A protein has these predicted regions:
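Short, acidic Ser/Thr/Gly-rich low-complexity loop/linker segments typical of extracellular
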Residues: 51-61
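Short, ordered, surface-exposed loop/turn motifs in non-cytosolic proteins
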Residues: 25-27, 34-49, 68
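Exposed, low-structure sequence patches enriched in small/polar residues
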Residues: 257-259, 391-850
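Extracellular beta-sheet/turn segments enriched in Thr/Pro/Gly and aliphatic residues
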Residues: 88-114
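Structured extracytoplasmic
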Residues: 103-104, 110, 114-286, 292-300, ...
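A short, solvent-exposed loop/turn motif at the edges and junctions
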Residues: 47-49, 74-85
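A short, amphipathic beta-strand motif
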Residues: 27-33, 60, 97
Length: 850
């Protein structure tokens, strides 16, 4: 879910694409209801006996191009009479088509424009689909032992509807040259200004046994307003939003969500199907199978499958749209088109794919036009030497060293003819002109700081980043107001050696804190030290405050947005720590980390160390532990979104297994205690097709030795009013002490499954959330200072040990409030009589997702 937010934010920074002008004649117009005069969205518009055509947009308008000087135009939509007329596109006329509502029969199925009585029983369309589903694997390319193909892909983003009126606005008047780069979308017919373009030339390889898929990238080209963002991070976000689509899967992944495929095993319970017409597609007679969800707010599609009228049920062409009322954010219009061809043995081969999207942040805006086009060619089923070489590589995507620096002659020679634009290098020229304007330069700087949190020290290839800026000012009870400044080097300074650090100062305790880190990467990096895969040796020294019982896993403890607390933040001491860490990550998803560490924990007036011997308590200023730690992690098929300071999984579909052990010996390198700590964890996202998904995190751990309380296991308390993963919203810091535990964090996102059925709520497009977090813990007698001498007394009066009852809190929530907010109401279900606790409360977070 964190990555959904990242991917969504960066998507709207990108802005969008133009499609080549390659046809001679334009066919355009609008389709309306003849009675109500309302526009008819998603009507099928095509030229008879051809594959040329489109679907009307949400405003009923259509636009496409053809080289034919004369053709028969056919417009059809469920519940209306078809429109058939001979046209002459050479005249470039605009057609206003009013369709008359009608009743029509499909076998036993009667459809009415106002109130439809749809039945699955004895419906020939449903039976037709069932036979398609039963035979969907018969000619699948994934049943072959091997195949390879050439891929050309172009993804572009553009300012949508960039007409003369918009060009006159004050913002664009400053850049009067923009009119030179305005193009016309061949899909929507709207004027667009392309501001970002990406191209890819690659070879795809597939092997059935052992299962493996590889992509060998020969060329990659990119230019646009998103240049200041991480190239790897942006590519990961775009790949997640515009995933390769397999219509034969049960679920189709798009926009970080999963949508029910019309050929899903549950399709007949999710979709209504109609046999519309018979037409010629590439010389073969095909049935036009239309489909639409029973519930238009659900995560499904409207569309058409053009299926051959033989026993193979071969899909020649697929056209998908989103229902107008779908509970999906920021996507105003989407058109997905796929074309297939047969191999000599009948295997279906994807020949062409395009997805066109109009994004809008709010209603009333023109938003962003985006289009991804992919052409596939040169299929072969005989293994090649190049394929054998690819399968020996550990990474799934193999990128040639010269891929990002290919000359324009390379692209001119390798682009498919249909992909050649009249303004192929327009984005490069546009960016050159924009960068010459100071107002654009400073706007880009501000956006870079807002979206990354860091300030680059130079315009291009910065050697150093200053930040993160959201950690500059914070505060707590021990330090009072706190200021912090820091930064890090990049691969442009040295691709193998990286430095990072910060200096902080508390005005109340008048102490300087800081971090100094030096990392040597055995792999040459492109931008940042933490790029996957990491193979490095790191030296790190840190001196700072220790907020006991608070460990924010996905943000900095100095984040200014965590400053507002529900209780006094006074469980704070000091620590100094020096460590050396060796990290090695593998493309298989396995990684390990070896760390040698020496740490000194220091008491404070808030957290005193009082060593108990009988009835005597002796103050101790500090203690030290020198330890070695081994961490193992396995996350197969994990993909990352890269940022300057961290990286996040693009999705949580991949399971993540972790195992760690820390060992220290008393007297070894100055260690005051023998210490052994083992921890294991697993997390996974489970999709339930149309019913949403569940994120599950399970962890367990144990401290094996007698140690003072700073070395025990303290559950992670969240004292802020924000929603934080893997933390407890109603638990106080240091409320419980354990030396062994088992915890769970389960959140079910229903994606509007219930609200979409409530007339009022479905208009709000809210989505439901149910969560439950809990921890079962135990503190053995040897680590309980009330029962055993030689330990530090618990410094907090209300600290307690757990009985046989686990700590549990549960919540219900609503996300997608104004498209950006999530509100949860949390109840504490156990240990409700403990003093000084909150039994329930409202929590909030920003949550931008599609």
């Amino acid at each position: 879910m964190r990555l959904m937010k990242k991917g969504t934010l960066t998507l709207f920074l990108l802005l969008a694409i133009s499609i080549p002008l390659c046809a001679q004649y334009v066919v355009q117009g609008v389709v309306t209801d003849s009675l109500t005069k309302e526009p008819l969205p998603y009507a099928s518009v095509r030229l008879k006996d051809t594959t040329e055509g489109t679907t009307t947009g949400s405003d009923g308008r259509f636009y496409f191009k053809t080289h034919r000087s004369e053709a028969v135009l056919v417009i059809s939509v469920i519940g209306y009479n078809d429109y058939v007329r001979t046209i002459r596109p050479a005249g470039n006329a605009s057609y206003k088509v009013a369709l008359a509502p009608t009743e029509y029969a499909l076998g036993e199925v009667v459809v009415k424009p106002k109130r439809e009585h749809y039945r699955k029983k004895d419906n020939p369309a449903v039976e037709f689909v069932r036979r398609m589903i039963e035979s969907r694997d018969n000619y699948s390319p994934y049943e072959k032992d091997f195949w390879q193909r050439e891929r050309y892909e172009k993804t572009t983003f553009a300012l949508n509807n960039f007409d003369e009126e918009k060009q006159k606005k004050w913002l664009y008047r400053k850049f009067d040259f923009l009119t030179e780069y305005v193009d016309t979308s061949a899909v929507t017919g709207k004027p667009i200004l392309t501001v970002s373009a990406r191209e890819l030339l690659a070879t795809d390889y597939y092997r059935k046994s052992p299962r493996s898929e590889k992509q060998w990238v020969k060329g990659r080209k990119q230019a646009g307003v998103d240049e200041f963002l991480s190239k790897q991070g942006m590519q990961a976000a775009i790949n997640e939003v515009f995933k390769d689509v397999d219509i034969y899967e049960n679920n189709i992944s798009l926009f970080t969500n999963k949508f029910v495929s019309p050929l899903s095993r549950i399709g007949t319970g999710f979709y209504k199907y109609y046999l519309m017409d018979t037409l010629q597609i590439a010389g073969e007679p095909c049935a036009d199978l239309a489909f639409t969800p029973f519930n238009s707010e659900s995560f499904g599609f409207n569309g058409h499958l053009y299926v051959t009228l033989d026993s193979t049920y071969f899909v020649k062409r697929a056209v998908f749209n989103f229902p107008k009322k779908i509970n999906l954010n920021f996507v105003d219009y989407m058109l997905l088109e796929q074309e297939f061809k047969r191999a000599e043995d009948g295997t279906r081969l994807l020949d062409h794919e395009s997805i066109t999207v109009e994004f809008k942040l709010t209603e009333g805006q023109d938003g962003i036009f985006a289009r991804r086009v992919a052409d596939y060619s040169n299929y072969t089923f005989t293994p090649t030497a190049e394929a054998d070489k690819a399968f020996t590589k550990p990474e799934r995507i193999i990128e040639e060293t010269e891929a990002l620096s290919r000359p324009e002659t390379f692209w001119a020679e390798n682009r498919p003819q249909a992909a050649i634009s009249q303004q192929e290098n327009s984005v490069d020229r546009l960016m050159t002109q924009l960068h010459s304007y100071p107002v654009y330069y400073w706007t880009e700087k501000v956006l870079s700081i807002l979206f990354t949190g860091y300030i680059p020290t130079s315009k291009e290839a910065p050697l150093f980043y200053i930040g993160p800026m959201n950690a500059t000012i914070s505060g707590n009870t021990l330090e009072g107001p706190r200021i912090r400044a820091g930064g890090m080097t990049t691969a442009w300074l040295n691709p193998h050696l990286f430095g990072k650090g910060y200096v902080a100062y508390g005005f109340k305790d008048e102490r300087v804190k800081g971090l100094a880190e030096l990392e040597y990467s055995f792999k040459k990096k492109k931008e940042y030290a933490n790029e996957f895969p990491i193979h490095s040796l790191k030296l790190r020294y840190e001196s700072d405050v220790n907020q006991y019982g608070q460990n924010y896993l996905y943000t900095s403890k100095d984040n200014v947005f965590l400053a507002l607390k529900r209780e006094k933040d006074d469980r704070i001491g000091y620590f100094r720590q020096a460590e050396m860490t060796y990290t090695n990550e593998f493309y298989s998803g396995f990684s390990f980390q070896l760390t040698a560490r020496t740490r000194q924990d220091e008491s404070s007036y808030l957290i005193p160390f009082l060593k108990k011997e009988g009835d005597t308590y002796t103050p101790v200023k500090d203690f030290s532990v020198s330890a070695a730690e081994l961490k193992l992690r396995y996350a197969p098929n994990e993909k990352f979104f890269q940022t300057q300071w961290n990286r996040f999984p693009v999705s949580l579909d991949a399971p993540v297994f972790t195992l760690s052990h820390t060992i220290a010996g008393k007297g070894v390198l100055g260690s005051d205690y023998t210490y052994n700590h083992t921890e294991a964890g697993i997390q996974k996202r489970f999709w339930f097709s149309a019913f949403g998904y569940t994120d599950v995190i399970l962890k367990a751990g144990k401290v094996w030795d007698k140690v003072p309380f700073p070395l025990l296991i303290m559950p992670n308390a969240n004292l802020s009013y924000t929603i934080q993963p893997e933390s407890y919203s109603l638990m106080n810091a240091m409320e419980f002490m354990n030396d062994e535990y088992f915890s769970w964090d389960v959140t079910y996102f229903l994606n509007g499954w219930l609200f979409n059925r409530v007339p009022l709520l479905k208009k709000l497009k809210w989505r439901e959330i149910v969560s439950c977090r809990g921890l079962y813990g135990h503190l053995s007698d040897k680590n309980n200072p009330a029962l055993s001498d030689g330990l530090f007394a618990f410094p907090i009066e209300n600290t307690q040990t757990m009985g046989k009852t686990p700590y549990v809190e549960a919540g219900v929530g609503i996300e997608n409030i104004f498209k950006v907010l999530r509100l949860d109401y949390i109840w504490r279900l156990t240990y409700r009589d403990s003093p000084g606790i909150d039994r329930s409360g409202l929590r909030i977070s920003l949550h931008m997702t599609f």
